[in-house]
Amino acid sequence: MEKLTDLNYTLSVITLMNSTLHTILEDPGMAYFPYIVSVLTVLFTLHKASIPTMKIALKTSKCSYKVVKYCIVTIFNTLLKLAGYKEQITTKDEIEKQMDRVVKEMRRQLEMIDKLTTREIEQVELLKRIHDKLMIRTVDEIDMTKEINQKNVRTLEEWENGRNPYEPKEVTAAM
């Protein structure tokens, strides 16, 4: 019986909408007709969808207050979007969730900054050690024997008989 009365109610609402639309269409100067039709359609859909949804939610849910609050907030947010507002209604639960998310993100960024700072300090210490090793030390006389690998090189006076052993000798070949 409830379904039958619900059907009669729906038919009467549709009839009311049709009669309203016909009276609007008779006015030739009506420029906002598509907007009015879309708003009426959305309102009717919200009306028809919200009541059964609320009934089902209240029957199946243990926390009925939260569900009702969420449904009402969703309906108002939809109406605000239709009206062109960018602001939305939020519940305390949503605000707390967003705050927890923000705090979690801030902690993550602080940990990352701490890691990066530690790495930078380690890099600075490494660069300081490299600089200390590469530091130029002034010496009075530079020993080049290590650089050219000639520790046992003799001077002309030190050679036997004063003769250079690496000079080419005259070689005669038999023909």
UniProtKB/Swiss-Prot annotation:
Q: Which SUPFAM superfamilies match?
A: Rotavirus nonstructural proteins
Cytoplasmic topological segments = 52-175
Query: What Pfam families does the record tag this protein with?
Result: Rota_NSP4 (PF01452)
Q: Which residues are glycosylated?
A: N8, N18
Name the record gives this protein: Non-structural glycoprotein 4
- Compartment(s) of residence: Host rough endoplasmic reticulum membrane; Host membrane, Host caveola; Secreted
Provide the transmembrane region boundaries.
29-51
Q: Which family does it belong to?
A: Belongs to the rotavirus NSP4 family.
GO CC, alphabetical: extracellular region; host caveola; host cell rough endoplasmic reticulum membrane; membrane
Principal subcellular localisation of the protein? host cell
Query: What the entry says about post-translational processing?
Result: Mannosylated. The N-glycosyl content is primarily Man(9)GlcNAc, with a small amount of Man(8)GlcNAc.
Which keywords does UniProt give here? Activation of host autophagy by virus, Calcium, Enterotoxin, Glycoprotein, Host endoplasmic reticulum, Host membrane, Host-virus interaction, Ion channel, Ion transport, Membrane, Metal-binding, Secreted, Signal-anchor, Toxin, Transmembrane, Transmembrane helix, Transport, Viral ion channel, Virulence
| Domains: entry comment | A disordered 28 aa C-terminal domain is presented to the cytoplasm by each subunit of the tetrameric receptor.
Gene Ontology biological-process annotations: monoatomic ion transmembrane transport; symbiont-mediated activation of host autophagy; viral process
Q: How does the record classify its membrane topology? A: Single-pass type III membrane protein
Instruction: Summarize subunit and interaction data from the UniProt record for this chain.
Output: Homotetramer. Interacts with the immature particle in the viroplasm. Interacts with host CAV1, early and late in infection. Interacts with host integrin ITGA1/ITGB1 heterodimer. Interacts with host integrin ITGA2/ITGB1 heterodimer. Interaction with microtubules blocks trafficking to the Golgi apparatus.
GO function terms (MF aspect): channel activity; metal ion binding; toxin activity
| Entry function | Plays an essential role in the virus replication cycle by acting as a viroporin. Creates a pore in the host endoplasmic reticulum and as a consequence releases Ca(2+) in the cytoplasm of infected cell. In turn, high levels of cytoplasmic calcium trigger membrane trafficking and transport of viral ER-associated proteins to viroplasms, sites of viral genome replication and immature particle assembly.
Where Ca(2+) binds, per the record, is at: E120, Q123
| Segments on the Lumenal side according to the record's topology features | 1-28
The record's annotation in InterPro entries points to: Rotavirus_NSP4
